[in-house]
Amino acid sequence: NQIAFISLEDNVLRDDFLDIYNHLDTSHYSIKKVLIHYDKKSVWNDFLYLLNCIKQIIVINTSHIVLINDNNYVVSHYKRQGVKVIEVWHATGAIKKFGNAIKRQYPINNYDYVIANSDYWVEPYSLAFSVDKNNVLVTGMPRVDHLFDETYKEEAKKNFYLKYPKLKNKKILLYAPTFRGN
């Protein structure tokens, strides 16, 4: 009953991973976290990545379910049969090409499921992650679930206008592209 969360972007559970983790019955599952964050390219960080890959091989292949939030070399090359891998992609859509839709160092393989925000993303996610269209699960994204909670929205709006009172009764446009600093 082991579930593994594997991220090469954060050294703590965040966003979708944290929301999923908080909804798991941890008394029923053994949870493993393989989390590592690299601030910059260096020989030391390359060595840490190698050690992390060895750890990933062990954790992935002793788990029943593995959740990832980005491309994963170890899953693509060393996943044993019977392990279910769920890609919880870090973006909420596919505005640009990515994954197997672009030229890459290695093809993405061995993913069993991908979660998507809407039916619109089934085709690009299927292509990018080499999964059958039926295995692209349109569930929405855990990190945006709270945006449908009216109490949360009212509280956020109230706090926003307390912080920026001059913006009250103004039209507000949000531009929020993906940026991970790498």
Give each language-model segment a name.
Residues 1, 72, 158-162:
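A short, compositionally biased domain-edge/stem linker segment
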Residues 2-3, 84, 170-173:
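Residues that mark the start of a beta-strand
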Residues 13-23, 144-182:
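Conserved catalytic-core segment of nucleotide-activated headgroup transferases in glycan assembly
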